[in-house]
């Protein structure tokens, strides 16, 4: 069935895993203590700091919260509060021109082609929605955010949970079988397939030197880049 909507992951799918791990994560980790000290009383920041403090045992100093968050970065923990605070820190970095977001070279032309043909694009990433908008807005291919019709993060649910995709289907208001989900993570594709979505495994050699074929792909159609996605 021809998809009517594209839903895409970011890290490892549109963009290199190494950019996130080697540029964005270290930038946020280094900036966290000063950012918390400077902005900790702002309501949006306070909300997330308090959420972390509650999780680690109640009232505690912001410096301890910052250390905890740095530890979560080291563990690559997908925590909503961490993602939100990282997004606020990355906002400053993008706007100062400290970096631009990496996109694989074929992605922007393909996304523009889909947009021109009237195929809506949605993003679902473990990064917060504000961070996603920055990623697309300050990309090395220019501002790609106008190509995106909607954004989803882990506030709608975990990416390896079928119910998350069911909620996305309800939000988009298109039958699940007419939505194509793109990701580099087989377990995410499994969850999307369970919810009725079409799937493609993005298996980039830069990120996965050993091709994931056969059982490793778990029945998902495999492509190595966006140009190979046949619609």
UniProtKB/Swiss-Prot annotation:
It catalyses: 5-methylsulfanyl-2,3-dioxopentyl phosphate + H2O = 1,2-dihydroxy-5-(methylsulfanyl)pent-1-en-3-one + phosphate. Monomer. PANTHER family: ENOLASE-PHOSPHATASE E1. Belongs to the HAD-like hydrolase superfamily. MasA/MtnC family. Pathway: Amino-acid biosynthesis; L-methionine biosynthesis via salvage pathway; L-methionine from S-methyl-5-thio-alpha-D-ribose 1-phosphate: step 3/6; Amino-acid biosynthesis; L-methionine biosynthesis via salvage pathway; L-methionine from S-methyl-5-thio-alpha-D-ribose 1-phosphate: step 4/6. GO terms for molecular function: 2,3-diketo-5-methylthiopentyl-1-phosphate enolase activity; 2-hydroxy-3-keto-5-methylthiopentenyl-1-phosphate phosphatase activity; acireductone synthase activity; magnesium ion binding. It is an enzyme of class 3 (hydrolase). This is Enolase-phosphatase E1. GO terms for biological process: L-methionine salvage from methylthioadenosine. Keywords: Amino-acid biosynthesis, Hydrolase, Magnesium, Metal-binding, Methionine biosynthesis. Its cofactor is Mg(2+). SUPFAM superfamilies: HAD-like (SSF56784). Its EC number is 3.1.3.77.
């Amino acid at each position: 069935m021809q998809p009517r909507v594209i839903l895409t992951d970011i890290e490892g799918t549109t963009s290199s895993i190494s950019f996130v791990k080697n540029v964005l994560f270290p930038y946020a980790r280094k900036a966290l203590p000063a950012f918390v000290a400077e902005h900790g009383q702002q309501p949006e920041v306070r909300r997330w700091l308090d959420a972390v403090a509650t999780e680690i045992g109640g009232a505690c100093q912001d410096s301890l919260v910052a250390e905890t968050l740095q530890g979560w970065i080291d563990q690559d923990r997908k925590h909503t509060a961490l993602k939100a605070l990282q997004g606020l820190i990355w906002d400053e970095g993008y706007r100062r021109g400290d970096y631009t977001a990496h996109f694989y070279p074929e992605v922007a032309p393909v996304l523009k082609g889909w947009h021109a043909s009237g195929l809506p694009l949605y993003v679902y990433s473990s990064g917060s929605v504000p961070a996603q908008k920055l990623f697309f807005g300050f990309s090395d291919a220019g501002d790609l955010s106008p190509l995106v019709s909607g954004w989803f993060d882990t506030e709608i649910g975990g990416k390896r949970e079928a119910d998350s995709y069911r909620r996305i289907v309800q939000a988009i208001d298109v039958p699940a079988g007419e939505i194509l989900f793109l990701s580099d993570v087989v377990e995410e594709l499994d969850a999307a397939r369970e919810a009725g979505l079409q799937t493609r495994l993005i298996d980039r050699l830069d990120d996965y030197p050993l091709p994931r074929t056969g059982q490793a792909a778990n029945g998902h159609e495999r492509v190595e880049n966006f140009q190979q996605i046949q619609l």
